[in-house]
A protein has these predicted regions:
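Short coil/turn motif common to extracellular beta-sandwich-like domains
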Residues: 286-289, 310-316
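Surface-exposed interfaces of beta-sheet-rich extracellular modules
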Residues: 313-340
Length: 358
């Protein structure tokens, strides 16, 4: 581990092997950094934030600070980041909110360039390139292999399909179809321009798939298709009824049908937002739990148990050490006998679980 003397790592933060933390960086008490993560000087990681192995956080990037949502009331929410992601200078990523599911997720091997912003409750896939100053509003879903051009801005609840390419300075207010390129048009509009052939070739798609997608694009978006008076939903359904149907074209058509037939303002997730059943499923339920601070490398599992008189809930805490570590005790007291790694406590207590290297 390489920890600069001016860096601040709060008590309770969990750091993997060969983690590097630069000068004046800050790592909060509830942060988990996987093996080989590099936090460069003046970077900040706060909140209940987890980074997978091999991530890099560049100067002045800020991850895990409270979401910019007036409905947020300080509830415990999380930011979950996969492996081998790069967050360049001044990138900001916020955790989820209680009304939006409680978690913001980012997959693996994404590149977020200078000044990009990922708002609360976003779900970002893997292997995406998010260029300088791209702005994702809350609840945006981005599938895998998406390429976002610089200064593009994405409206709340938009879904961006896999292998899509969004041109620079594009205003994205509706779902973006997979495999296609959209660019800024006149005024504040954006429009579908072509199939992302170059991106598909780079990611291993064959000529047959690309040709089928180009044919589908012509049937859906060409000037002749738009001028023949047939509604876009009918054009999509005609393609879906074609047999045999290329799997990539089928994925494209099903994505479009969700947006046009079931979406609201061109955004499928917006329609779910209006559905009371889905809204309830998004809302984060408040769960009582014992506040536990972990020192060293290990985890504490909690389960609810009934009290002797049945008048209040108690919690069983079970300590599980990571390989190469051993549980040492609760609140600084050695765990002897070994059964003490599992105890029952009142939820009003604040516990410290200590793990020591073997």
């Amino acid at each position: 581990m390489n920890l600069h003397p001016t860096a601040i790592v709060e008590h309770g933060a969990q750091l993997g092997r060969e983690v590097s933390i630069g000068a004046y960086a800050y790592v909060g008490a509830n942060v988990v950094l996987g093996d080989g993560c590099r936090v460069l000087h003046h970077a900040t990681i706060e909140g209940h934030t987890t980074l997978g192995e091999g991530c890099e956080v560049f100067p002045y990037a800020v991850l895990g600070t409270p979401p910019q949502d007036v409905k947020f009331r300080g509830e415990r929410t999380t930011l979950e980041i996969g492996a081998n992601n790069i967050f360049r200078e001044m990138v900001t990523v916020h955790p989820g909110t209680g009304n939006g599911g409680g978690v913001t997720r980012i997959g693996d091997r994404n590149l977020l360039l200078i000044g990009a912003h990922v708002a609360h409750d976003c779900q970002i896939g893997s292997r995406c390139i998010i260029a300088n100053y791209v702005q994702f509003a809350g609840h945006v879903h981005v599938e895998d292999f998406v390429n976002m051009g610089g200064h593009s801005a994405v409206h709340h609840f938009v879904t961006i399909g896999k292998h899509a390419f969004v041109g620079g300075m594009t205003r994205v207010a509706a779902d973006v179809p997979p495999f296609l390129v959209i660019v800024a048009a006149r005024g504040t509009r954006s429009e579908v321009r072509m199939v992302n052939g170059v991106g598909l070739e780079r990611n291993g798609y064959g000529r047959e798939d690309i040709a089928a997608l180009k044919s589908a694009y012509m049937a859906l978006y060409s000037r002749r298709a738009r001028q023949n008076g047939i509604p876009i939903r009918d054009r999509i359904q005609t393609l879906l009824n074609t047999r045999p149907l290329n799997p990539q074209v089928e994925y494209l058509c099903e994505f479009l049908m969700r947006s046009f037939a079931h979406g609201r303002n061109g955004r499928y997730l917006e329609s779910l937002r209006q559905d009371p059943v889905h809204r309830k499923s998004w809302k984060l339920e408040e769960k009582a739990e014992v506040p536990v601070q972990v020192v060293g490398h290990g985890k504490v599992h909690q389960s609810r148990v009934d009290g002797n008189d049945g008048s209040r809930d108690l919690f069983r805490l079970t300590a599980r050490a990571e390989p190469g570590w051993a549980f040492a005790g609760w609140n600084g007291n050695p765990g002897d006998p070994p059964e003490a790694d599992s105890i029952v406590v009142d939820p009003t207590r604040q516990m410290i679980a200590t793990f020591k290297p073997l």
